[in-house]
């Protein structure tokens, strides 16, 4: 199963987890502190560790965390756990981040998301925010036995493969596929222009092809529309209109709706299936899918970054943004020198 490739037994990560309330349905670490990246991140001595905690009851979890880690929160802590949870659930991409926290001698940023919100994002790509993080190799530190969550995690990976294949030609390499997958959650993200280094996707994939393969190998082997030449690192996908229609029909619901919105002329109000049938026969099918992905990511990334001003506080937001801009500047200097 693809999810087995996500598990980690890292003692250091579990030591950090011990500083937080235990009621987690899922906890995972991601980013350059977990998996080596090329570019500016490769030269950071102590990169910040990124973590996400998934909780069944955000109000109860934040209440416990405020008692244990009061200093982690911005001034929103004065309004109590219910307001914090309301901000978490109702604004941005449904996740509440506390950045620039020293924990067990390590600089970390952690986000909190409700289990229900995460499952919705994994299945439907409402925001493609945390779901996008989980399309790339991560280290799962803790996960409960929820079959619903595990099925949603697996479905998210399958959706990432299908979406990427629709944007690729009939024949392509493993690396081509992994680059498309890694780029999904950055497609349309304004931070790829402001702050984040533009070559970020390549920097993520190239040093981690083995980890991407571990994550997706079983899905690629079982896909009935795909020929996976594993030893050659090459793949072929059915690009017939019938094949593409089958692929489009399995896409996450929100992505299908965005495709329908892009293609449906004013006044027609066609149903989604009719639109997908048209797109399947369109030579620009891949471009339509790419545009639809961007139309999900762009607004959610803007909303989440704006929300960060309130959840992190102005001072931390300025420091965090400066770190991001510094990474972009170092990458630019390295390219031009």
UniProtKB/Swiss-Prot annotation:
A GO term for molecular function: phosphatidate cytidylyltransferase activity
Indicate the principal place this protein occupies in or around the cell: mitochondrion
* Key words, A-Z: Lipid biosynthesis, Lipid metabolism, Magnesium, Membrane, Mitochondrion, Mitochondrion inner membrane, Nucleotidyltransferase, Phospholipid biosynthesis, Phospholipid metabolism, Transferase
Protein's GO biological process: cardiolipin biosynthetic process; CDP-diacylglycerol biosynthetic process
Q: Which reaction does it catalyse?
A: a 1,2-diacyl-sn-glycero-3-phosphate + CTP + H(+) = a CDP-1,2-diacyl-sn-glycerol + diphosphate
Q: Which Pfam families match?
A: Tam41_Mmp37
Q: In which pathway does it act?
A: Phospholipid metabolism; CDP-diacylglycerol biosynthesis; CDP-diacylglycerol from sn-glycerol 3-phosphate: step 3/3
* UniProt subcellular location: Mitochondrion inner membrane
Q: What is its EC number?
A: 2.7.7.41
GO CC terms of this entry: mitochondrial inner membrane; mitochondrion
UniProt tissue specificity: Brain and liver.
> How is this protein situated with respect to the membrane?
Peripheral membrane protein
Query: The organism sits in which domain of life?
Result: Eukaryota
Cofactor dependence is on: Mg(2+)
Biological role stated in the UniProt entry: Catalyzes the conversion of phosphatidic acid (PA) to CDP-diacylglycerol (CDP-DAG), an essential intermediate in the synthesis of phosphatidylglycerol, cardiolipin and phosphatidylinositol.
Family of this protein? Belongs to the TAM41 family.
Name of the protein: Phosphatidate cytidylyltransferase, mitochondrial
For this protein's source organism, the top of the classification is:
Eukaryota, Metazoa, Chordata, Craniata, Vertebrata
């Amino acid at each position: 199963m693809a999810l087995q490739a996500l598990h980690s037994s890292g003692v250091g990560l579990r030591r950090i987890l011990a500083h937080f309330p235990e009621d987690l349905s899922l906890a995972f670490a991601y980013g350059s502190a977990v998996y080596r990246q090329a570019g500016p991140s490769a030269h950071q001595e102590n990169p910040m560790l990124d973590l996400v905690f998934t909780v069944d009851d955000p109000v109860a979890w934040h209440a416990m965390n405020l008692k244990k880690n009061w200093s982690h929160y911005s001034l929103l802590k004065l309004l109590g756990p219910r307001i914090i949870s309301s901000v978490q659930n109702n604004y941005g991409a449904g996740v509440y981040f506390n950045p620039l926290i020293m924990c067990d001698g390590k600089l970390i940023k952690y986000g909190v998301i409700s289990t229900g919100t995460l499952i919705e994002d994994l299945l439907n790509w409402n925001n493609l925010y945390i779901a996008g993080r989980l399309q790339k190799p991560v280290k799962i530190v803790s996960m409960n036995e929820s079959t619903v969550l595990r099925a949603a995690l697996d479905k998210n990976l399958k959706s990432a493969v299908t979406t990427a294949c629709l944007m690729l030609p009939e024949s392509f390499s493993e690396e081509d596929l992994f680059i498309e997958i890694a780029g999904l959650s950055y497609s349309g993200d304004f931070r790829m222009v402001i702050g984040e280094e533009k070559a970020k996707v390549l920097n993520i994939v190239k040093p981690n092809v083995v980890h991407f393969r571990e994550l997706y190998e079983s899905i690629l082997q079982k896909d009935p529309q795909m020929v996976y030449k594993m030893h050659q690192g090459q793949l072929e996908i059915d690009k017939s209109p019938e094949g593409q229609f089958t692929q489009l029909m399995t896409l996450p619901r929100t992505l299908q709706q965005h495709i329908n919105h892009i293609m449906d002329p004013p006044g027609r109000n066609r149903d989604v299936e009719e639109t997908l049938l048209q797109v399947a026969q369109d030579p620009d099918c891949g471009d339509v899918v790419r545009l639809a992905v961007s139309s999900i990511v762009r607004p959610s990334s803007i909303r989440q970054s704006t929300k960060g001003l309130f959840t992190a506080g102005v001072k931390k937001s300025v420091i965090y943004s400066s770190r991001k801009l510094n990474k972009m500047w170092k990458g630019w200097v390295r390219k031009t020198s």
